């Protein structure tokens, strides 16, 4: 069925007001206790009231590393869609779109229609969201190239599209940025010709002035700052240096060690702007997280989950979820863009290695039948710099799992990842979902005081390799669970139950009046779509899914 563009929830629990959508929602879950070696499961229920402001703001996005491959590609994508550009390629004419974006190209199921078929709507139709074509961009970069020159240097887009975008991007030029050589690879020094001078405190203040200038000059209601610059080395967390907000601000004032990304995070938080870290380093040190908590500003991270790691978070979930004991994961990458060149330095590679290696931890820990405490698969990650392949990253993976009775299963996967074309829609989703979360508040019957989401916005985990979560919260890396979290929280804002995929009405021997089937048997009730009748069976056969014809459903006796 085609995705509908608009819908309304008809329920006494949902009110569409002129300023907000208010919904009553029953959150049902379970709590588990242990008594004498026995697990006791206690169903619980909490009544929430969600309020989502309907007024969509004028939103600006500031990219740190605006002139890099990701920043120039995202800017080009929004311009190409806004201008409705098309261009010739060797395989035919292409048109601008937002493929790869969860919010713009993904759909969600609302339920079943009168024919028993699922009805889907675009993800962006669930709640009022900023239209991506309305985004306003600005940002910083250590390279002074304008965005048109940066686009040409990146070599990501077809030449015909670059030619059309050139006059629109030529006037866009990054603001000077912070360059601290010891945090990134030495090979980046050749690009560093557009720098903020002065002490760390002066650099922090300049970043804050840039944010304020962008807000006023572009007439913006909100700004979201997103780090898409180079991977930095890890910053050691030291008591008295960056362990608290007070100590971190003092460290900046005294000119002690602080990474450029942490400077941008602190500046963003102080200006009330959400900050999202798209690289693997530990930008959001404890002091930055405490500052975000004090200022009630959203932060999220770490490291865009775009290619190889996204596949891994699906495949390992499938293997372990199927009862196969994955024992070895070997991941090899080679790429030729500037990210690859920067990662050729050992300290920067170590940051990436950590974020790519932790992605399977929660899946392993979820199955104590397969894995003893402390047991985990061997996991090796290799990244090599090969300039010729440019932005077209190659990812090769080998997964070896144990089967029953001593058998083994090996999966080998080759994945060509267009690095920036995969990352750009993720950046788009991060900005749109973060802004939406800023308009959502809720309360419970037990705590009627309205509140918002925790400043560490773990709802964004679907989009990050190493997702940050509030202290004490479980880290979820399995992709299906991460997507379900976003979808079900947005459904809760409309008073809708979580999507559980049970389809129980199709599995009952004797449906009641509410769950009544459309016809007596699947074969006798073909589903209609715009192309005409099609068999209900999934393999194209009329009858059961294994190809055998169905018999008439017998009448069951009633008591």
Swiss-Prot record:
It is found in: Cytoplasm. GO terms for molecular function: inositol-3-phosphate synthase activity. Pathway: Polyol metabolism; myo-inositol biosynthesis; myo-inositol from D-glucose 6-phosphate: step 1/2. The lineage of its organism: Eukaryota, Metazoa, Chordata, Craniata, Vertebrata. Belongs to the myo-inositol 1-phosphate synthase family. The modification Phosphoserine is found at residues 279, 357. Key enzyme in myo-inositol biosynthesis pathway that catalyzes the conversion of glucose 6-phosphate to 1-myo-inositol 1-phosphate in a NAD-dependent manner. Rate-limiting enzyme in the synthesis of all inositol-containing compounds. Coiled coil: none annotated. Keywords: Cytoplasm, Inositol biosynthesis, Isomerase, Lipid biosynthesis, Lipid metabolism, NAD, Phospholipid biosynthesis, Phospholipid metabolism, Phosphoprotein. This is Inositol-3-phosphate synthase 1. InterPro entries: Myo-inos-1-P_Synthase (IPR002587), Myo-inos-1-P_Synthase_GAPDH (IPR013021), NAD(P)-bd_dom_sf (IPR036291). It catalyses: D-glucose 6-phosphate = 1D-myo-inositol 3-phosphate. NAD(+) binds at residues 67-70, 141, 177-178, 188, 191, 228-231, 278-279, 303, 306, 337-339, 352, 390-391, 419-420. It comes from the Eukaryota. GO terms for cellular component: cytoplasm. Its cofactor is NAD(+). GO terms for biological process: inositol biosynthetic process; phospholipid biosynthetic process. Its EC number is 5.5.1.4.
